[in-house]
From Swiss-Prot:
GO cellular component, one term: plasma membrane
Biological role: Probable transporter of a GTP-driven Fe(2+) uptake system.
Gene3D superfamilies: 1.10.287.1770, P-loop containing nucleotide triphosphate hydrolases
Taxonomic superkingdom: Bacteria
Binding site for GTP 2: G35, V36, T37, V38, E39
Record's bilayer topology term: Multi-pass membrane protein
The UniProt record lists the keyword Zinc-finger: no
Positions of GTP binding: N120, M121, L122, D123, V149, S150, T151
Name of protein: Fe(2+) transporter FeoB
Protein's gene: feoB
Amino acid sequence: MKKLTIGLIGNPNSGKTTLFNQLTGARQRVGNWAGVTVERKEGQFSTTDHQVTLVDLPGTYSLTTISSQTSLDEQIACHYILSGDADLLINVVDASNLERNLYLTLQLLELGIPCIVALNMLDIAEKQNIRIEIDALSARLGCPVIPLVSTRGRGIEALKLAIDRYKANENVELVHYAQPLLNEADSLAKVMPSDIPLKQRRWLGLQMLEGDIYSRAYAGEASQHLDAALARLRNEMDDPALHIADARYQCIAAICDVVSNTLTAEPSRFTTAVDKIVLNRFLGLPIFLFVMYLMFLLAINIGGALQPLFDVGSVALFVHGIQWIGYTLHFPDWLTIFLAQGLGGGINTVLPLVPQIGMMYLFLSFLEDSGYMARAAFVMDRLMQALGLPGKSFVPLIVGFGCNVPSVMGARTLDAPRERLMTIMMAPFMSCGARLAIFAVFAAAFFGQNGALAVFSLYMLGIVMAVLTGLMLKYTIMRGEATPFVMELPVYHVPHVKSLIIQTWQRLKGFVLRAGKVIIIVSIFLSAFNSFSLSGKIVDNINDSALASVSRVITPVFKPIGVHEDNWQATVGLFTGAMAKEVVVGTLNTLYTAENIQDEEFNPAEFNLGEELFSAVDETWQSLKDTFSLSVLMNPIEASKGDGEMGTGAMGVMDQKFGSAAAAYSYLIFVLLYVPCISVMGAIARESSRGWMGFSILWGLNIAYSLATLFYQVASYSQHPTYSLVCILAVILFNIVVIGLLRRARSRVDIELLATRKSVSSCCAASTTGDCH
């Protein structure tokens, strides 16, 4: 079979990602475009004659880049197409918005690259009474047009057949430009490198005349003749760029008049009716908050019901199973304990997180595909404008509920460096999926019937602190106003199940692999560090271990937030959590369990793998039956509680160590707001600079310590009024000084992003890494 590389390009919200998932299924690899952290997705699929590598290009409305501050997505798409890496392009076009989508199509066809138009979302177009003559459109464009409904898989085989039959586009003159424009474009093309095809050289000439700044990188000596060409044109026309765009729009209007009835189309009645409620100035925000509450409620409720299968099952396989193998094969005791408690315990810490994190990713994917996520940005526009940010900056922040890394990377879609940087600084405060796992464990141990409210309040606190951080930056070191907010609101539709599953699987797989590597290594390290004293002797009591000795020295620093000296395990959790927040649960589980080790030894004669696995399935089935009972819906934390008797087990020890719900909640505030994990730090450094990464870390530590201290000292004021008053005044005074210093430093701060100064011409090459972080 012949190998073929195809670029998939289209407008945002045209169904491009759904088509990508339909074609490639699970055969996807996620990496980065070289030199930048914008995600690059590649997939594999086969046709009758070809083995295809499909490259999913960022969504863009055109290939024209007027300003260096424009979204990097447009730059990447343009450079990839001009690089010649793609043998063929598939242009995904939204049939319900044909006129707007055809602008990009015309630019692609003018380049002369073999192109297939995938006319998607025909089901939505039909509901709006839009009729499109496919054959007439194909004849007008001079390339194959394949009707599709990617959410239902309709037209996929026809698209594969068109790929096998692909050839050069027919030589159809699509756009009629004014003769002076063509003359100057041809004069520029003559002095461009001769290895570029003539058609592409003329296209580059028109792009340069339109004001596209990145086409100059390919034009060679022609860029030196540009000013003279523009001067000659201005003697004959007012604005060359306007004439070029107008010629294209006239061509599009002529095509649409012949092939469709878009002028008599009816807007979606369902979308219009729902938007009257969802976008209502009074109801929009409460509905958004309810959707966010519903997201983590279902994640905890259904995910918690599935947890026994992963928890009890992994204990049976990786802890008791390894112990049984060790005793049966007569391993040394130390090796059996090391493998079962270190390796097996680490795996057992990761797997129970899967159901809840997976449900959250599934819910986020549903919101994105259904069209609600764009509405959330619209609803939050007024609030974001108050911060000097456009409403669409809230979209990457919402993505932060799943993981902060793509949230930081998503700031690339914003136009101005100031807006990108402010969004990057706000992103780490959005509560990610890993923090949800921590909140669920603490809620089960400390908050009982108020568990759901406690977790919801932490989510809202993260949003509030992100907003306050934006306000602080706006009035200190990043003054300015937001750019005008224009964003497409796609029609509501039911997401395709296959697409949802693939998106959820890709996110969950990345989480498990990333978390698993770190948690297992940390669990093994902690198990070893717990077994020896500072002098190197083996200890029987964890409180005599080297880890305990070192942690006790540091723990008094956290006394103002409610972490007492004997609760040194909580301090270790904070330090390991800087590597990855999901490690906090594993750390506390390892350390609190070690302190509560029972004298009862494992008996291999009583071990029955089948019975333990059956018990896991049975417990999961019972949990699923109870999931939607009224009591569980009122208190979803109960579904994931996991440890019914709080007097025993790791959760019981944790309950005793913290001593009060106030201390536990204060600890959670600190976990929510303090330093982001290593992968997020790396993303911040790559998207901005190491200096801004350092600022993000220090600012996060400051507000985490300040807010946690204020909460705990107010909650426990009656127990030690003098100490609490001193702590409260110290925190307030310190932050007044910090804000004052930031205001004075405003004139010396460079908000230009490091990433915007990078050469974008290198973005066409694929990153060799498969990790999107």
